[in-house]
Amino acid sequence: QFDRNYRFFDAPVGLVITLDRTMGAGAFLDLGMALSYFCLAASAHGLATCGIGALANHADLVQEHLQIPQDQMIICGMALGYENHGALVNKWRTTRADCDAYAYFSGFDAPL
């Protein structure tokens, strides 16, 4: 299953997301927000997305194969296409920890 990351899970579109190497740490936050909105926009148009962090594991190979300039840093990939509702992997759900297990909220119990 993990190898399918490198084939973009057979999606019709595979995106390689890069950042200019000279950008500061804040650019990662900006990119994360942009990718979030990209995923929301795709969903609004009936498309599904899947972020692929594994692509960065072989950034040198990807960079060479796609002739991406060296001043760009490969951050991740993104598969874009139509969700396959029948695929077993799309039915799998992990257990989720309750929010209280990893987050603390203070001051939200007062009325607005």
Residue positions per predicted region:
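Acidic, surface-exposed loops and disordered segments
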Residues: 1-112
